[in-house]
Design a protein with these regions (language model features):
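Conserved SAM-binding loop of SAM-dependent methyltransferases across substrates and taxa
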Residues: 53-65
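N-terminal regions that are enriched for targeting/export leaders
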Residues: 2-25
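Conserved alpha-helix/loop element of class I SAM-dependent methyltransferases that forms part
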Residues: 24-46
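General structural signal for secondary-structure boundaries
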Residues: 33, 69, 89-93
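Class I S-adenosyl-L-methionine-dependent methyltransferase module
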Residues: 6, 76-99
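Conserved class I S-adenosyl-L-methionine
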Residues: 43-53, 68-69
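Conserved acidic E/D residue at the C-terminus of a beta-strand in Rossmann-like folds
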Residues: 70-75
């Protein structure tokens, strides 16, 4: 995984006020079916997605693309996404839902 500080691409005024070390979204509420319809995902696709809380990335994985590249300016959001992936791998469904 390549990680960088997203503030480098922003104006100084915006970057000064942007705290990338807090979790802003713990769950995404957008309708992921819109993404699915827009992508028309096939198994040979490589998809670029905003990481955010990881919900859309997980939904897109159900279509078994070749790869998904998830990006986010916030290291906290990336860490949350990774924790969700690890939780899915190692916890039971009820344990995961209780988080």
């Amino acid at each position: 995984m390549v990680v960088g500080d997203g503030r480098a691409c922003l104006s100084n005024e915006i970057a000064a006020d942007l705290d990338l070390e807090v979790i802003r979204y713990s769950q995404v509420w957008e309708d992921y079916t819109l993404l699915e319809q827009a992508y028309c995902i096939r198994e040979d696709y490589r998809i670029l997605s905003v990481g955010s809380a990881g919900c859309n990335v997980l939904a897109l994985l159900l279509h078994r693309p070749q790869a998904i590249i998830a990006i986010d300016m916030s290291l906290a959001q990336i860490a949350l996404m990774e924790l969700k992936f690890i939780g899915i791998k190692y916890l039971s469904y009820p344990e995961f839902l209780s988080l």
